[in-house]
Amino acid sequence: LMLLDEIDKVSSDYKGDVSSALLEVLDGEQNKEFNDHYFGVPVDLSNVLFIATANDLSGIPGPLLDRMEVINISGYTENEKYHIAKLYLVEKTREKNGLTKSQFKIDAGAIREIISHYTREAGVRSLERNIDKVCRKVCRKILTGEMDVVKVTKKNIQDFLGPYKYKDENGNLK
């Protein structure tokens, strides 16, 4: 099994054309006798299962895309993102920033506000970055003596992340 992660970001430059090499690697007729030009040795790739990931298919050359079976995977729902944040991301970022459970609390409403008003993605990277930003600001409040314990809520989330970034389809803040 070989994972080709974010294949849509592969580019060509003066050093070579990666997509041409991938064409040879992914072609079932040619990959039995693939020649690795870097090491100068032949490699039999005929029994390898290739899995490629991409965020945007338009960045993949047509001939390369023709050698793949495209399986679209939908992003997380807002509810799934909430549970991922609650069960994993909050704890991870809290520990990363050296905060104890008693020093930092974030309620469900605040997490849901971050998801709906500060992120616009299928995954949770931006959600994690925003929770991390909240934690850093909590650290500053504690280190400056402004507060000993910080509870982040739906009502005060803008104090930590600023004005909402995203609106609903009607142009209204969600």
Regions found by a protein language model. Give the residues of each.
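Conserved catalytic/switch belt of AAA+ P-loop NTPases
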Residues: E6-D44, D66
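AAA+/SF3 P-loop NTPase mechanochemical coupling elements
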Residues: D17, F34-A54, S102-D107, V152-K155
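Alpha-helical scaffold elements adjacent to nucleotide-binding pockets in ATP/GTP-utilizing enzyme cores
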Residues: D17-V25, P63-R67, E80, I84-L89, ...
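Conserved AAA+ ATPase core "coupling" helix
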Residues: L49, I60-G98
